[in-house]
C-alpha cells in the first residue's frame, strides 16, 4: 500500500492548528475538530456538546437562520457534524472551486455561532425526538447502557446525547458560556483535505480566522485518573425485538501509549474483524451460536472499552458468551499463529488506507487522532506501525486488557411472552 | 474523456476496465443479469440465498479459505442480490488483482453449495430479516415496498420473508446457479489499475468458454426495448406497479417515536421524465434546505428525520418520502408531508429553489463518486439496465437540462395518491 501523503502542519499566531493535505480529485473538505465532547460536561449540562453541535449551522456571523443550509447546498456542498465523548467536528465538503464558501461557513460557525434563542427552543424538541428514537433502537439502548454500566465513574459514563432533564435545563446562557469556553483557537484543529494549494489555503484561513481570539477555558478539568470500572457486571434488558443484541466489554487504557494502541487494534482484527477472524469462525461459522459477531476497540483520550458485539437467538446467549471467552483466553494464553496475525495486520492496514479514499474519510481520520493525541504522528505512521506489531505484543495486550473479572456484559433481549412485531392493515 | 476500455469476450462476457492512475485501490463488481424479481412466486428469496452462498465454499476452497485468502492480502469479497441483478464485489490493493480475480472466478463459477452451508446461511438470512424488522426505518420501508409493488415482480423483498426463506430447498439453489452463472449474462466492472492484456488473458484462461446455451431462463441481454418486451410478456396487466396506491398499512411495535413512509411511482431510469422527477424529489426532500426539512422539521418541528429519495429500478422506479415523528403528531405529519408532495405542482419552485436542488444533486454526485467501489457499482448497474456504463457519467447534463415546468408536470403526473406505511406504538 502506498504511504499516506505528508500533512502540511501549520499554526496561526492565535493558536489555531491548520492541517492540510493536498490531493487531486476536484473535491475539498474543510473540517473543524473541536476538543469539546461529553467528557468535558458537568452532569447538569450533560448533552450540551451535542445540542450545541445542532445549533452551529442555525445561524453564525453574517448568516441568518437557515442561510447556511441554503448557501452550502446552493453550491452543491455537503455539510455535517458529529459529537462524541472527546470531540465535536463539523465539516463542509464541496467541489474544490467552492473552497472559499466552505471555509467561510466553517469559520463563522466556530467563531461566531448565533445560538439564536428561538432556534434553540425548537432544536431542543428535535433533540428530544432524537432521544426518543434512540430508545426505540436496540443498538442505541445497548451502547448507552454499556457505557453507563461499565463505568463506575469517569468521563465516558454519561451519554453524549444527554438526558431529557439536562436537555430541558440547558438555556442560551449555559450554551453560550460552554461555546465560548471550548470553541477557542487553541482547542480547534482545522483540516483542509482536497484539491487546494496549501500556501493559498493557509492565506485564506489567516484572512478568515486570523482575528479569532478567545482563551480556552475548559468547563471541567480532567486528567483521566477519575475513571473507575464496575466490572464484573451483567445487565439484561427486555425490549420489543426479534433477536438478542449483546456486548461483552473490557477496560482498555487511554491512547497515550501508542505501541499498546497499535497492538490493541491488531487484536481487535484478529479476534473479530473479517470473516476469517477467530470469533467469526468459531462462534458464527463453526458453532452457529451467533448470527453476527465482531470486535471493536475504543482509542480515546481517557480509558475506554474493548468490546465484542453480537446478535443471537436468546437461548444461545450463555453458550455464546462462554465460547467467546474461550477464544479470548486462547489469545491471552498463546501468541497468535503467523497466518492469523498477518491476516489481521494486512486487513487493518488496508481498512485504514481505504478509509482515506474520500476527502471526508481522510480529514476524519487525521482530525480524530489529532484531537485525541495532539499530534499527527499516530495517524500518519499507522500503516507502518501496524505492519510491525508482533505476535507477542498482541498477546501481551490480550493478557493485560481482556480479563473476564473486569468484564461488563449487556444484552437487549426479546420480551419473554412472545413479542414479534404485529402487522395489520387498515 | 473518461478512460474506460470495454471488451466483449468470445464467451459473451462484457468487461469494463477503468484505470484510476492516482489510486492503488482496486474494486471489482461482477454483475449477473438475474435478480430477486426473477424468483418464482413461491420461492421468494431464492436468488438472494444463492448469491450469499457463492462465497461460502467452492470446489477447491472452504468458506474459511475464501475469506482467509482475500483477507490475508487485506481484501474482501461480498455477495449482493437486488431486485434487478445479483453478483459479487471485491476490494483489494491493485497489486493483488490476481488473487482477487482468482477468488471471484472461483466463487462465481464453482460454488459447492454444501448442505451444511445452505442450512447455515438460510438461518442467518432469517435472522437478518428479523433484525431488519427491529429497525424502525427498514421495518416500515419493507412493508411500504410490498404494498406499493403488490402483484408486481418487485412485490416481495429481495431477501424474501422469514417464512419463504424457510421453505427454500437446496436443489433449487444448484439449479438456479447452473442456469444463470454463464459468461454471456455477466458484466465485470474493474475500477483501478490492472494490466489489461494479462487481466483479459487470465479471464480467458479461467472463465468458461461460451455462450453455453443460447436461451434458457436468462433474461435476454439485448437493447432495453427488446428486454422490455421480454419482461412485459411475463407481466399480467394487473401487475402494473403501484397497485397499493391509496392504501395504508398500519404497523405496530413498542416504540416511542412513530414513522411514516409514503410511496409514489417514478419513471424508470432512461425515460424522458426521469430526470425531472429526480429534481422534483430534490426540491421536495433532499438536503436541509429542501421543503420537507426546512418546513416540517426546521419550521414546524414535526420531525427529527424527514426526507425523500428516488429508488431507480429497471422495470419500475419509486419515490418515497419519510418522516419520524412524535406519535401524537403522526396524522398531522403524514398529511403535511402528503400535501407538500401534491403542492409541488401548484407551488412550483422558483429559479433559486430549483438551482439549489440542482446544485445539491450535482455536489452529492461528485462527492458520492469519490470511491472506486461507488464507480464500479454505478457502472455495473446502468450497464445491466441496458443504459450503458456511461449513463451515470452524464447525470450532470441531464439534471442541468431540466426546466421548472418539467418538474411541475412530472410532479403533477406522479406525486399523488401514495401508498402509505405507518408505524405507531402498540396499544397498552
Each model region followed by its residue ranges:
Chain B
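A generic "binding-loop/recognition-motif" signal
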Residues: 13, 195, 288-289, 296
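His/Glu-based metal-binding/catalytic segments typifying zinc-dependent metallopeptidases
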Residues: 19-24, 29-34, 185, 213-290, ...
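Short C-terminal domain-edge/linker segments immediately following a structured domain
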Residues: 46-49, 59-63, 119-123, 238, ...
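Charge-rich, well-structured scaffold segments of protease-associated domains
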Residues: 2, 8, 19, 65-230, ...
Amino acid at each position: 500500500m502506498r504511504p499516506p501523503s505528508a500533512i502540511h502542519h501549520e499554526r496561526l499566531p492565535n493558536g489555531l492548528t491548520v492541517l492540510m493535505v493536498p490531493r487531486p480529485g476536484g473535491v475539498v473538505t474543510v473540517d473543524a475538530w473541536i476538543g469539546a465532547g461529553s467528557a468535558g460536561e458537568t452532569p447538569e449540562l450533560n448533552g450540551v456538546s451535542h445540542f450545541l453541535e445542532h445549533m452551529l449551522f442555525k445561524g453564525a456571523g453574517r448568516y441568518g437562520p437557515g442561510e447556511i443550509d441554503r448557501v452550502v447546498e446552493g453550491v452543491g456542498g455537503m455539510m455535517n457534524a458529529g459529537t462524541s465523548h472527546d470531540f465535536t467536528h463539523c465539516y463542509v465538503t464541496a467541489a474544490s472551486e467552492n473552497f472559499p464558501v466552505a471555509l467561510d461557513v466553517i469559520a463563522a460557525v466556530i467563531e461566531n455561532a448565533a445560538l439564536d434563542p428561538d432556534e434553540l427552543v425548537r432544536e431542543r424538541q428535535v433533540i428530544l425526538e432524537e432521544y426518543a428514537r434512540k430508545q426505540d433502537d436496540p443498538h442505541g439502548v445497548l451502547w448507552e447502557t454499556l457505557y453507563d454500566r461499565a463505568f463506575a465513574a469517569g468521563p465516558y459514563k454519561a451519554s453524549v446525547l444527554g438526558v431529557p432533564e439536562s436537555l430541558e435545563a440547558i438555556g442560551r446562557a449555559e450554551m453560550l458560556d460552554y461555546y465560548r469556553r471550548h470553541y477557542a483557537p487553541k482547542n480547534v484543529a482545522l483540516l483542509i483535505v482536497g484539491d487546494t494549494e496549501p500556501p493559498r489555503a493557509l492565506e485564506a484561513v489567516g484572512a478568515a480566522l486570523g482575528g479569532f481570539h478567545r482563551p480556552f477555558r475548559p468547563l471541567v478539568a480532567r486528567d483521566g485518573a477519575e475513571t473507575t470500572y464496575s466490572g464484573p457486571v451483567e445487565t439484561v434488558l427486555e425490549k420489543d425485538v426479534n433477536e438478542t443484541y449483546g456486548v461483552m466489554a473490557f477496560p482498555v487504557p487511554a491512547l497515550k501509549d501508542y505501541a499498546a494502541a497499535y497492538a490493541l487494534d491488531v487484536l481487535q482484527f484478529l479476534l473479530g474483524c473479517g470473516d476469517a477472524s477467530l470469533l467469526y469462525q468459531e462462534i458464527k461459522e463453526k458453532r452457529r451460536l451467533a448470527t453476527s459477531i465482531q470486535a471493536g476497540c475504543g482509542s480515546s483520550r481517557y480509558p475506554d472499552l474493548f468490546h465484542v458485539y453480537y446478535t443471537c437467538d436468546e437461548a444461545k446467549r450463555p453458550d455464546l458468551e462462554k465460547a467467546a471467552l474461550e477464544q479470548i483466553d486462547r489469545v491471552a494464553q498463546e501468541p497468535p499463529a503467523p497466518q492469523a496475525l498477518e491476516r489481521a495486520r494486512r486487513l487493518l492496514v488496508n481498512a485504514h488506507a481505504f478509509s482515506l479514499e474520500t476527502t471526508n474519510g481522510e480529514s476524519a481520520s487525521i482530525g480524530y487522532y489529532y484531537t485525541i493525541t495532539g499530534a499527527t504522528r499516530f495517524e500518519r505512521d499507522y500503516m507502518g506501525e501496524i505492519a510491525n506489531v508482533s505476535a507477542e505484543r498482541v498477546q501481551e495486550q490480550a493478557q493485560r486488557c481482556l480479563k473476564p473479572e473486569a468484564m461488563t456484559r449487556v444484552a437487549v433481549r426479546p420480551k419473554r411472552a412472545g413479542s414479534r412485531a404485529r402487522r395489520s392493515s387498515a | 474523456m473518461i478512460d474506460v476500455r470495454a471488451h466483449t469476450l468470445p464467451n459473451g462476457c462484457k468487461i469494463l476496465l477503468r484505470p484510476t492512475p492516482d489510486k492503488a485501490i482496486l474494486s471489482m463488481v461482477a454483475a449477473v443479469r438475474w435478480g430477486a424479481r426473477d424468483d418464482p412466486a413461491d420461492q421468494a428469496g431464492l436468488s438472494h440465498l444463492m448469491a450469499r452462498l457463492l462465497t461460502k465454499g467452492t470446489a477447491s476452497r472452504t468458506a474459511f479459505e475464501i475469506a482467509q485468502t482475500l483477507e490475508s492480502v487485506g481484501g474482501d469479497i461480498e455477495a449482493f442480490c437486488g431486485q434487478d441483478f445479483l453478483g459479487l464485489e471485491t476490494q483489494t490493493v491493485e497489486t493483488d488483482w490476481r488473487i482477487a480475480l482468482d477468488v471471484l472466478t472461483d466463487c462465481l463459477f464453482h460454488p459447492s453449495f454444501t448442505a451444511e452451508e445452505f442450512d447455515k446461511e438460510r438461518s442467518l438470512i432469517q435472522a437478518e430479516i428479523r433484525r431488519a424488522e427491529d429497525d424502525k426505518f427498514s421495518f416500515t420501508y419493507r412493508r411500504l415496498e410490498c404494498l406499493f409493488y403488490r402483484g408486481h415482480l418487485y412485490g416481495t423483498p429481495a431477501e424474501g420473508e422469514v417464512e419463504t426463506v424457510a421453505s427454500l430447498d437446496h436443489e433449487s439453489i444448484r439449479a438456479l446457479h447452473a442456469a444463470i452463472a454463464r459468461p454471456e449474462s455477466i458484466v465485470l466492472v474493474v475500477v483501478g489499475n490492472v494490466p489489461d492484456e494479462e487481466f483479459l488473458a487470465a479471464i480467458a484462461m479461467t472463465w468458461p468458454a461460451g455462450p453455453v446455451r443460447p436461451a434458457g431462463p436468462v433474461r435476454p441481454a439485448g437493447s432495453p426495448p427488446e428486454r422490455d418486451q421480454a419482461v412485459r410478456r411475463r407481466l399480467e396487466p394487473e401487475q402494473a406497479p403501484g397497485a397499493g396506491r391509496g392504501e395504508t398499512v398500519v404497523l405496530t411495535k413498542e416504540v416511542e417515536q412513530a414513522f411514516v413512509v409514503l410511496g409514489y411511482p417514478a419513471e424508470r431510469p432512461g425515460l424522458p421524465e426521469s430526470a425531472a422527477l429526480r429534481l422534483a424529489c430534490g426540491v421536495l426532500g433532499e438536503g436541509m434546505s429542501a421543503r420537507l426539512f426546512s418546513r416540517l422539521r426546521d419550521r414546524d418541528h414535526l420531525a427529527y428525520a424527514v426526507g425523500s429519495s428516488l429508488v431507480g429500478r429497471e422495470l419500475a422506479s419509486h419515490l418515497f418520502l419519510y418522516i419520524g415523528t412524535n406519535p401524537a403528531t403522526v396524522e398531522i405529519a403524514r398529511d403535511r408531508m402528503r400535501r407538500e408532495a401534491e403542492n409541488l405542482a401548484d407551488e412550483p419552485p422558483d429559479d433559486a429553489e430549483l438551482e439549489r436542488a440542482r446544485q445539491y444533486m450535482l455536489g452529492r454526485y461528485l462527492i458520492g463518486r469519490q470511491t472506486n467501489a461507488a464507480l464500479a457499482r454505478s457502472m455495473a448497474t446502468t450497464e445491466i439496465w441496458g443504459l450503458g456504463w456511461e449513463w451515470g457519467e452524464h447525470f450532470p447534463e441531464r439534471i442541468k437540462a431540466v426546466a421548472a415546468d418539467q418538474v411541475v408536470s412530472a410532479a403533477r403526473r406522479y406525486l399523488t395518491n401514495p401508498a402509505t406505511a405507518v408505524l405507531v406504538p402498540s396499544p397498552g
